Amino acid sequence: MSASVFIERRKIRPLRTEAACIPTHALCFNVLGIPYMDPGNGGIRPLNPDDSDATACVHGVAYLLTSDDLKKVILSEGGGIAYQVARLNAKLLLDDSPIVVDTLIGRHNVDASNERLPSARYIGVLTRGANELNLPLSYQRRLAEQPIYQPKSGWWFQLGVALFLWPWTRAAIITERLVYKHQGPDGHVPAWFLFIFDCLLWLMWAQHDYIHGPIFGRGDGR
């Protein structure tokens, strides 16, 4: 949502930019990241029909993109390893006019009870983007009040963090390079790549949940 990330870092040039919301969906953090670093990444899930809070639906920015820039977006978000494209109904905040958007939702349907907390860095990107877009203050407050993962102090916990992140951050770097190597025409990686990635993802989180977390302290805010 932050222009500094979307436009400057990813070198994407939108043809049009508009603040928008998706009335049927809410922001969530159901995309598993890396424990101790970015445990929960942003996604969206259907709103509870009983939720009447106007700030509950997800707000953000709608970009009009070329097909090449859409491919860049997909690649920058992992080539389909974490997200899949979904077509949803949205509305522009300027005049409430309806539009249809292609957005990214989590590839795995992680239950709300199993979501992990986002990092302070991750929420910082969202809050800066919301401020840049002048999104409703009520929604900005909602982002500011979002609970975040807060690392513990102490040498034992920090030792655990270092031991855990040393192999898994390197695995993430290699995965990112392989995504670009094996990308398809639309920016997505093939099914065999997704299978291997999923095995590594579940292995990483199993190590955290059943070995590392109990010994050194959890790295997901739960």
From Swiss-Prot:
Is the keyword Transmembrane helix assigned to this protein?
Answer: yes
Q: How does it sit in the membrane?
A: Multi-pass membrane protein
Q: Which UniProt keywords apply?
A: Lyase, Membrane, Transmembrane, Transmembrane helix
Catalytic activity as recorded in UniProt? an alpha-(gamma-L-glutamyl)-L-amino acid = 5-oxo-L-proline + an L-alpha-amino acid
> What is a GO molecular function of this protein?
gamma-glutamylcyclotransferase activity
Q: What is its EC number?
A: 4.3.2.9
- Its predominant location is membrane
Its biological purpose is as follows: Gamma-glutamyl cyclotransferase; part of the gene cluster that mediates the biosynthesis of an unusual class of epipolythiodioxopiperazines (ETPs) lacking the reactive thiol group important for toxicity. Firstly, L-tyrosine is prenylated by tcpD, before undergoing condensation with L-glycine in a reaction catalyzed by the NRPS tcpP leading to the diketopiperazine (DKP) backbone. Afterwards the alpha-carbon of tyrosine is oxidized by the cytochrome P450 tcpC to form a hydroxyl group.
Q: Which family does it belong to?
A: Belongs to the class-I pyridoxal-phosphate-dependent aminotransferase family.
Please give the name of this protein.
Answer: Gamma-glutamyl cyclotransferase gliK
What's the name of its gene?
Answer: tcpK
